[in-house]
């Protein structure tokens, strides 16, 4: 057999393959590569070199010191990384298609039926309250018989997980308060990237999550045994056995900024966008924008997506800053992926270099609906409160709130989507304050930047905070479209930076709204807090059960949703919805002080959701009229 190495670098003048028996070796075996007329460099070695570590030295005529850098193969299927600044890496030769999937296939699900749980692979098991035995995050996540991980996710009833970036990424940023590579780090005392929105390899799973470490080990090679490839598959297979689809959050609009040896060294002129002064464009805010319209860049993205589908059985993808990806690439991704799985899920952030959820919808993509998020919750908890607070944020009004119920369709004023299943309805994501913290601060019951010494007291919801959390959740789960919640939203998780962090964080003890760099209890789910707010957790479970059982909240026709007019109460809303001969009434009172009395259609109605509980088991019945106190919500079903 033979092992063939290829690298596309059309502007390079010389490329050398460097192989290593161990990644620690300072010098390896070097092989001069040959260039073809298409800009592809090639070297062929006799034998099948599985387990071999390798990289490329890429020389350009206009740059010095290129030969000092070992570049990572952009098509590497497994990667080992040395945990220090600049994240030096080596690719590993592995054999694909050797995993026993035990008959596993993709989960094909109508997008309207999706209930997505956005989560970080480590967060669900890293806190001791999860009850998980120390092991790698991939393995810990699927350990049975524990309070956290897959057991907790299954108990909620969600049917899809969306993993924060789990392609190999830049874990380590530049030294704090030091000049490095022309930059000065005055923003990140942790010198870490925990969320992973700095992709280093489009084809390899993140190696950190395959290590049996409680925290990142600095100055150590991780991923040497390529364990991530099998552990990632074990994880996907375990979720599929529970009927839970697996989506990946992927970042193709830029690459890892704080390292050498990536596509910027391989061929920056080909792969990146530049401004008219010759600097990297950074509409992503991450130092470089990937030139997705280049044929070989587009090909790499598409082949990456198809590889994750075929090799790892991934059911769907969420694209970070989707508007930075050119339209032709967006269209080809969906076209090629649907050949493999016609129900593959593609959603995105419809911003970054513009804002165009309608453009994505026209091309068959879903988008995160920031309009429902801001309209219902608000844009910020200080002076941008939304409907649940009895306020109108921006250009919201009762007409727009009604449009959110129907999927924010283009047929309504300021609508965004051609189809309801293109609207990813959410009130919380990894970005910004959690919904629980937004409400804590928005009510004035917790002051921003206050040092929180009693985290249990802070976590425990007041009666008013609980009402607002329930009202928001009820609106979310009864609206047409895709439903997404973020990990811990169901117990109003609070992201308090621990007082005992070992770095110079001036915000320690306060509530965080951008925890991307914290591999600590700020992000880890504390399941004791889920117990503290069990009433809210049970309410979420009941809403999930309700949505899954009754298609009226997922598949009702626009004409089958009929709104009830509430005179002189602008923040009250009601509607009836019919589907398959089953009729419901959904009622909300977001008024701050006023009760609302509503006349019901003729007949007897069972109560499925009241201000205390939610589910599919009737909580009582009612006829003729119903009175809603401020912040009450109800779902009634015709008896």
Task: Identify the function of each model-found stretch.
Residues 1, 25, 36-140:
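The feature marks proteins involved in alpha-glucan
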Residues 3-13, 545, 563-601:
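Carbohydrate-binding surface patches
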Residues 7, 56, 119, 163, ...:
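Conserved, mostly hydrophobic/aromatic
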Residues 9, 51-52, 619-639:
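C-terminal beta-strand-rich structural cap/linker in extracellular carbohydrate-active enzymes
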Residues 56, 527-562:
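Aromatic- and carboxylate-lined catalytic core of secreted/periplasmic carbohydrate-active enzymes
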Residues 75-76, 122-312, 322-341, 345:
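Substrate-binding/active-site clefts of carbohydrate-active enzymes
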Residues 334-504, 553-554, 558, 564-569, ...:
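Conserved alpha/beta catalytic core and glycan-binding cleft of carbohydrate-active enzymes
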Residues 430, 603, 612, 629-633:
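Tight coil/turn sites that cap or link beta-strands
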